[in-house]
Amino acid sequence: MMDLVLEEDVTVPGTLSGCSGLVPSVPDDLDGINPNAGLGNGLLPNVSEETVSPTRARNMKDFENQITELKKENFNLKLRIYFLEERMQQEFHGPTEHIYKTNIELKVEVESLKRELQEREQLLIKASKAVESLAEAGGSEIQRVKEDARKKVQQVEDLLTKRILLLEKDVTAAQAELEKAFAGTETEKALRLRLESKLSEMKKMHEGDLAMALVLDEKDRLIEELKLSLKSKEALIQCLKEEKSQMACPDENVSSGELRGLCAAPREEKERETEAAQMEHQKERNSFEERIQALEEDLREKEREIATEKKNSLKRDKAIQGLTMALKSKEKKVEELNSEIEKLSAAFAKAREALQKAQTQEFQGSEDYETALSGKEALSAALRSQNLTKSTENHRLRRSIKKITQELSDLQQERERLEKDLEEAHREKSKGDCTIRDLRNEVEKLRNEVNEREKAMENRYKSLLSESNKKLHNQEQVIKHLTESTNQKDVLLQKFNEKDLEVIQQNCYLMAAEDLELRSEGLITEKCSSQQPPGSKTIFSKEKKQSSDYEELIQVLKKEQDIYTHLVKSLQESDSINNLQAELNKIFALRKQLEQDVLSYQNLRKTLEEQISEIRRREEESFSLYSDQTSYLSICLEENNRFQVEHFSQEELKKKVSDLIQLVKELYTDNQHLKKTIFDLSCMGFQGNGFPDRLASTEQTELLASKEDEDTIKIGEDDEINFLSDQHLQQSNEIMKDLSKGGCKNGYLRHTESKISDCDGAHAPGCLEEGAFINLLAPLFNEKATLLLESRPDLLKVVRELLLGQLFLTEQEVSGEHLDGKTEKTPKQKGELVHFVQTNSFSKPHDELKLSCEAQLVKAGEVPKVGLKDASVQTVATEGDLLRFKHEATREAWEEKPINTALSAEHRPENLHGVPGWQAALLSLPGITNREAKKSRLPILIKPSRSLGNMYRLPATQEVVTQLQSQILELQGELKEFKTCNKQLHQKLILAEAVMEGRPTPDKTLLNAQPPVGAAYQDSPGEQKGIKTTSSVWRDKEMDSDQQRSYEIDSEICPPDDLASLPSCKENPEDVLSPTSVATYLSSKSQPSAKVSVMGTDQSESINTSNETEYLKQKIHDLETELEGYQNFIFQLQKHSQCSEAIITVLCGTEGAQDGLSKPKNGSDGEEMTFSSLHQVRYVKHVKILGPLAPEMIDSRVLENLKQQLEEQEYKLQKEQNLNMQLFSEIHNLQNKFRDLSPPRYDSLVQSQARELSLQRQQIKDGHGICVISRQHMNTMIKAFEELLQASDVDYCVAEGFQEQLNQCAELLEKLEKLFLNGKSVGVEMNTQNELMERIEEDNLTYQHLLPESPEPSASHALSDYETSEKSFFSRDQKQDNETEKTSVMVNSFSQDLLMEHIQEIRTLRKRLEESIKTNEKLRKQLERQGSEFVQGSTSIFASGSELHSSLTSEIHFLRKQNQALNAMLIKGSRDKQKENDKLRESLSRKTVSLEHLQREYASVKEENERLQKEGSEKERHNQQLIQEVRCSGQELSRVQEEVKLRQQLLSQNDKLLQSLRVELKAYEKLDEEHRRLREASGEGWKGQDPFRDLHSLLMEIQALRLQLERSIETSSTLQSRLKEQLARGAEKAQEGALTLAVQAVSIPEVPLQPDKHDGDKYPMESDNSFDLFDSSQAVTPKSVSETPPLSGNDTDSLSCDSGSSATSTPCVSRLVTGHHLWASKNGRHVLGLIEDYEALLKQISQGQRLLAEMDIQTQEAPSSTSQELGTKGPHPAPLSKFVSSVSTAKLTLEEAYRRLKLLWRVSLPEDGQCPLHCEQIGEMKAEVTKLHKKLFEQEKKLQNTMKLLQLSKRQEKVIFDQLVVTHKILRKARGNLELRPGGAHPGTCSPSRPGS
């Protein structure tokens, strides 16, 4: 087929298009395909018009040749069509079977997948049912909890109502105080005027005092001159005297006397005058000085008063300013209303005049003119009255509106108070939770202590047992020694016959007997008291009592040993036999009483053990039930931080179960919602043309509304697209702005609770919260992380706990750091503070969520008005822009109003009157509240306000501080004015750019609609007031957040009543540190880590506490967490640099053309805000580093801070002025350029590229700012760490490693900063710019490559349009970029190199655009030239008029028509095939999409199956662990019981030993009796050997008993050792069961009661062979009686435990009751056994009772028989032997009864749904797992079948497509063959259509 296509066909015309010679130089197409095929130009040869030359006429031969050629071509064409159809049929018949097979397989796979899906849904339904059944179990507990909660809520409501009443009273009092303050301001104004007048008078007085001082100086000078003149005159007088003395005159004496008199008189007068003048001058001078001092003091006082008055006047001025502002707003409203009234009156006057004119025209000719005038006057009066009434109604309505707004504000305040009370209740609840945790920890500690004590007691008991064994051994040796001594003393007894010694010894023994009686009585009482039942005490106290009883038993044994020594001594005398007999009777009675007490004690202990075991069993059953439920659910939910379930109580377990059930339900709903969203997305993927935009919008809206109903998501697609694209536009500009605010951190916690409640297209603020949260995380995380956080609330819980834990750590560190110069806190106060902070931090997030939701729903109505008022200057083009403004306004209002407005301005000074920091903050408030709302959203002056607040506490000079403060306020006012001016200029610039770029004019209706909205907003003063108050509160909170720590510390000095107000200030979320949100962490206002690190060093130097090491460890831990946060931040920055391009493309892709209109405004505003936020953050950091210095430096530092603030304010002013000048120049330039430019068309591709450039530049700037901040913070942290190392003893290696990590972080941050700043290294910015340049170059290269080859004129025109639009847009965009670059150079000190690179880039782009325009012009000219050549008239053709010629032409026309019809058929067939191909392609794409969907579902099903398998395995493992624990506890219980049994055996053995000793004593007593009888007889020697024989038999019996006792002790010790070995090995359950069966199978021999035929050798005893039964093969319990084989002789021998011959003993087989051995448990409350065993036991007990009664009778008859025997002096040994035999028979009966008792089993009967519950659960789980396996296998089969079917269908479609392609090529070839060769008939003529012509 390809040969037909590729071979050269002669019939094909030379030109590509139908026009001949349009493009002469274009080469032929390689494949021979005509680009204009199907257009109708080259399908038919126009022979009559094109092939014949116009100069030559056509003859008949030509016509005949033409006809024959046409016939041939027609025939060939038909043949080809026929063969083609046959070939197609053959090709289609071939591979159909394979296609059918694949189709069938695919169908099978689809069915299997459907089945699997159905089965999985059924499994999910089963799981939900199981969870609901579990939930029903805890229903009663939930109801109880609900009732308790209702009661608590009722109490809280009562409290809240009381507090509301109190607060209303406070409000009235505050209003009264306000009025008083208002009156006080007027009086203070008057006082200030008076003081100013007084000041002027004082100044005048001061000037008079200066004049007086000048006069005094002149007088002093005159006095000095007079003194000088006096001195000169005295010198003259002296000279005259000397001359006169030299003269010799007779009358010398007379003249000298006269001269002296004459000289003395004036001298004295002058001296007097001078002295008087001096005194006067001195007095005057003193008086003047005193007056000057008094005046100076008055001046100082006046100045002080003036300073205070200035301060007060400033405050009053501010208050007056606020009031005047309010009055101005009211006056404006009044003026507006007056203007409206005037307009209405003017309109009314005009209407009245019009009416009068009309009526005068009507009634000019009538006589009733005057009556009509009077009627009109009445009408006008009525209208006036109506107008008056309406105006009064308007006033009344305004008043009612004001009242309603006031009531609304009051209600909001009450709601906030209620929420505060709810927070307090939550805090109390969190306190209760903390106490519960503490109690749980204490319980665990107590358990550990109890276990340790049990171990200690076990060790003690073991030591006591070993000691008692040793003592028993010693006692046995002593007894043997005593028996030997008795034998020796029997011989010695015959020698002692002296009576005196007997009497003395008798007296001694009587005394000893009395003592022994007293002792035995004391022992009995002690024994009885010690053996009283312990009652309902714990096991621990019982074990203590057992140990004490054991010690008392040992003491009793010692005392009895002493008694036996006394008895041995007493045997030396023969006369003391009677006394010994009496004593033995008493001892026997005491022994009997003791045995009874021992039996009662054992019974009581058994009952107590049974009760305790029953209680434990019940607890373990309920405990295991709840623990199974909780562990199953916790395994299913994969909870990370769960406690061990074993330590929970029942209430906690029930609570846990209910919580987990709730979680499961929520997860199930989430799963359903996600399924819905996936299905909707898959459905929406095929709708409309805007597929990617809609997909992105629907994904985000449905993921935001994943937990909402379906009704709330029915929002218009256009609104969604506009909103989301605007969100994307604002995203990059709002990142830093959102990061610099603390409220955005709460968005992390709030966004899960937000709701989309507006169904008309305008979303509620909750959606914006989530949008803000996604914007926060957008630079750091990719989109999947945010979606995962939204869909998983448990992850959010974990993050919130981490954040709260970090907050708790930082607050714990910060608490107490401002106490350097104050008194130290006591540890108790510290603990209270820490607990207080903890409760606040625990209770905060939940309440904040509620506050955020409610507050924003309340504010939803008023906020869009604010946004429209703010944006009233801008041009709004479309409805989408209006929506964007709405949402922007809501976002800004949300940022401006803090959601947790816990600090109200009214209650702060009342609650915190003792805290100086609060007062300072409130004093400095009015300076900040004057800032305007738009720019004050960036908290620029937070730290200055803090320094002002601190100023009032420090002893700085008041004058300097007030001056600096006034200067700061002036600068703030100027800055505010400049900012408003700057914003107006920005708006003008944006308008000019919009007009220059040819934007559409804004809708007049929208522009006209804005002022009424503003007016409506102004009509509601309550709302405006609410906004103002919230903004001021926000500013207060911004200022107070930095002083939080000092307030916390000062609050501890205050009384505890003030502490209740502290939670409101602690609810500031800005102290939260999180390593996951590092960007928020860096740009947050309060950087606690730096303050902690610097202030912590001061604290470590000044405060030396006991827990210094813990403090240092805590600091190191905090530094490590901070380092981790920085490392995460660097990693996220790197990740962000990689993801930035993708994010930008997504942003540009979702943007529409109308959204691009508002971009420059947003961009400029965002840049301004980010730059100012960066500067603010740097300044905040600087002040925070300077903050925590030593107290000596604070005075100077405050002044320095204020000066620095002044400098920064001046710098900002200068910067604003420069920006304003620059903007003026830019506006002027734009207005000049606007005249020359016309609005051209723009292309979206160029816009997106320019937008990418601006966004990347903005991101580079933002990244540079973040790097600067983080580097500064890292440097401060390194310094703080060095100071900490110097101040404390930290491990050197750890500190060095930590310091190296810090240095590495700092170096990395410096590198990043250089990279962002310079851009010379291979950084993010250069990469993005280079990629952009390469992309543009590639586009231009392809364009230039396509220029010579473009065949159509439309393409060149489009390209020229594109190039011109590109040029015009780039010129505009580069101007914008130049402007943004200039602003960035001014604000952020960007590098000059980067600017030059941008300018160079712009120049190159302009050059290339100019070149492209030139090439477009050339192409246009060429096309015009070709068009002119094309329009040439075709030459006329000669027509012949012959009939032959006409017939030939008609035949030619007929053939031509036939040809055309055939061609049309071919074209139609090709079109049909094309349509079929398109349909097949569409069906194939649908099938591929469905296949992908099925594959995804299959993968999800597979994952779910794997998860279920994992959960099943984990549950099985957990069950095995529980079984193992139960087994271990059972082993422990069995071990304890075995020990108890061993101790009981030891006690019984001790009793037996005592009994044997008493029997020996009785024997010795009998011997004494016999000796006495013989002595009393006539001395004939020994008569008869019967008593001695009896004694001999008795002794033999005693020895046999002793041997038996020793063997029993040995067997018990071996049993104990083997039990310990078995328990130590931890053998399996079968072996343990075998051991218990074997232990129960060991039985005491069943001996028939034959008291007369007893022998010592035939006495039954336990042998060591009894422990051969521990073979596990023999210990298998038989299942039924029929299956138990009869025992052989060997078995009976091995089971019988007789040491002698087994003739008298019957075999004892361990019998299990049929079918009920599974119920056997050691904690059972029931006994199970055979009725034969029970009857035999009853028989043995009755026999024992009868024997005991006989023995009682014998003991009562014993003393009387002794007296009779003394009288008769005859031997009567019969009663003694009878008593001994009865004792042995009683012993045998007791042993037999004990053996019978062992044959009964303790069982726990199966209750309904209790016994096989666990097994049934495991069985159900296994069945479910197997079902799941089967379903999964079937689904996999289905999927495979569907895959095969789809592959088959793909192959079919491919085959069809290939066939169609082949047919298309054949048809094209056929068409070429049908065309004529004009050069064949006339080789001489040359066709103009050939390329050679």
Swiss-Prot record:
GO terms for biological process: brain development; centriole replication; centrosome cycle; chromosome segregation; establishment of mitotic spindle orientation; microtubule bundle formation; microtubule cytoskeleton organization; microtubule organizing center organization. The modification Phosphothreonine is found at residue 1001. It comes from the Eukaryota. Residues 1034-1048, 1364-1381, 1500-1519, 1651-1661 have a biased composition (Basic and acidic residues). GO terms for cellular component: cell junction; centrosome; ciliary basal body; cytoplasm; cytoskeleton; cytosol; extracellular exosome; Golgi apparatus. Residues 1015-1071, 1084-1105, 1347-1381, 1500-1521, 1646-1706, 1754-1774 are annotated as: Disordered. The keyword DNA-binding does not apply. Keywords: Calmodulin-binding, Cytoplasm, Cytoskeleton, Golgi apparatus, Intellectual disability, Microtubule, Phosphoprotein, Primary microcephaly. Residues 1663-1706, 1754-1766 have a biased composition (Polar residues). GO terms for molecular function: calmodulin binding; gamma-tubulin binding; microtubule binding; protein kinase binding; protein-containing complex binding; transcription cis-regulatory region binding; tubulin binding. Residues 58-196 are annotated as: Interaction with NCKAP5L. It is found in: Cytoplasm, Cytoskeleton, Microtubule organizing center, Centrosome; Golgi apparatus; Cytoplasm; Cytoplasm, Cytoskeleton. Pfam families: CC_CDK5RAP2 (PF23246), Cnn_1N (PF07989). The modification Phosphoserine is found at residues 547, 1238, 1490, 1663, 1666, 1893. Potential regulator of CDK5 activity via its interaction with CDK5R1. Negative regulator of centriole disengagement (licensing) which maintains centriole engagement and cohesion. Involved in regulation of mitotic spindle orientation. Plays a role in the spindle checkpoint activation by acting as a transcriptional regulator of both BUBR1 and MAD2 promoter. Together with EB1/MAPRE1, may promote microtubule polymerization, bundle formation, growth and dynamics at the plus ends. Regulates centrosomal maturation by recruitment of the gamma-tubulin ring complex (gTuRC) onto centrosomes. Homodimer. Interacts with CDK5R1 (p35 form). CDK5RAP1, CDK5RAP2 and CDK5RAP3 show competitive binding to CDK5R1. May form a complex with CDK5R1 and CDK5. Interacts with pericentrin/PCNT; the interaction is leading to centrosomal and Golgi localization of CDK5RAP2 and PCNT. Interacts with AKAP9; the interaction targets CDK5RAP2 and AKAP9 to Golgi apparatus. Interacts with MAPRE1; the interaction is direct and targets CDK5RAP2 and EB1/MAPRE1 to microtubule plus ends. Interacts with TUBG1; the interaction is leading to the centrosomal localization of CDK5RAP2 and TUBG1. Interacts with TUBGCP3. This is CDK5 regulatory subunit-associated protein 2. It comes from Homo sapiens (Human). The lineage of its organism: Eukaryota, Metazoa, Chordata, Craniata, Vertebrata.
